[in-house]
Amino acid sequence: MDDWTEGEIRAIAVAMIGERYRRYRLPDAAAEAAMVGSMARYGQIAPLAVCLRQEGPEVLDGFKRLAAAKTLPAVTVLQARLVVADEPTAKAIILGLNGIGARMKELEEAWIVHALVREDGLSQHQVAELLGRHKSWVCRRLALLERLSEECAR
């Protein structure tokens, strides 16, 4: 996959696609079931967005499509578009791409902001700039997650 260029779409075996960023999204069983029906009827309409990590391609956008493909025996490959991104940018892309249609839940936004600050070491100001948001938005998302108990946040 070393010759895969940014923006290029390739067919990738479903079994090779990782979900390390799945933890930033809440499960939605109804939406996933609807996606299974759609993929069974129409096939894959839009490519996944993936970034490359040492383990292989990791989904940034298309978690429901990947989940649907895993339940459909006839679907063994998915089309994926490569996005070149470091860790903070990958998280920002998840927020940006998933905020287009059905808006992400505040808890999902908080998980990403928390990861950018606590795991990636960015300041709140840097996170605000990266995400194109106001510092107060970042502060509110951090406060939301940090006020929840550890048990509720997982």
Name these PLM-found stretches.
Residues Y24-L26, A67-R147, A153:
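Amphipathic, charge-rich alpha-helical segments that serve as recognition/docking helices
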Residues M1-V83, I94, I100:
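Short, charged/polar connector segments at secondary-structure boundaries
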